[in-house]
Amino acid sequence: LTLLLIGIIRLILPAALINPGDYVLMTTPGYPVFGTHAKYYGGLVHEMPLLERKRFLPDLKAVPAEVLERAKVMVLNYPNNPTGASATPEFFEKVVAFAKEHRLVVIHDAAYAALIFRGQPLSFLSTPGAMDVGLELHSASKMFNMTGWRCGFVVGNPLLVKAYGDVKDNTDSGQFLAIQHAVAEGLENPSFTKRIVSKYSRRMTGLVRLLKGLGFKARKPGGSFFLYTASPRAAVSADGSRVEFPTAEAASQWLITEKLISTVPWDDAGAYLRFSVTFAASSVAEEKEVLEEIERRLSDVKFEF
């Protein structure tokens, strides 16, 4: 079953699913809104860290038994924000088995599913048994560069979609029809998204190259428009002056105040910075200029990691 939605699904779903005392299993770092709203309804959040050595996939076996006894929902997001990591069919198979064993609802936030640089998009619902336990959320905002227009759809287990729809019917009155027509046009013309993916892939390749040249251990992700890389511990200027970064937050603040380069810091599961390739540039030449400017601003210091 599929239901069209506007951009408030993560706010509505907790109202449909969470009772006081229920646990939500959330990945960290990650987009926290579902967990935040679950708390409004008396829910609790258990964080599952995403570690580089585990390919930024959560360790399901590490969830404590006392949490699983009260767990109701597990929220996943692949390709992942902020890590850019992609899930595998084998991982999703483990998720389905885990959800059935512990009677969990799986919400897979697939906002970036179409933005992949290799292979074909992977839907959680393509996993055998996933329709028994899950929902998948899709975002036209990311798929067609329609951020701010707030349109997408939810698909999955009919009972879960109905539960969402019952709350949604009393929450909003639907999206502006012209935006719905625009989304339909995009869905009927996948070449739109292919061009967007090609642009992001090209920019990501350039960003990875320049950051590696500056000492970052940057690697091109499997998808999304985010580049997640270990934060530097210090920056040393040509005159020998040194700035220490005890946290990713400190490094991010230095980058924006001293170099006018915006990043998002994460200190939840190691110190990392999230770069993005959504900068404004209307041509390949302008993209090159932006990347060269980033390199110029950072080339007068040596980063230590």
Language-model segments: residues:
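PLP-dependent class I/II
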Residues: 1-305
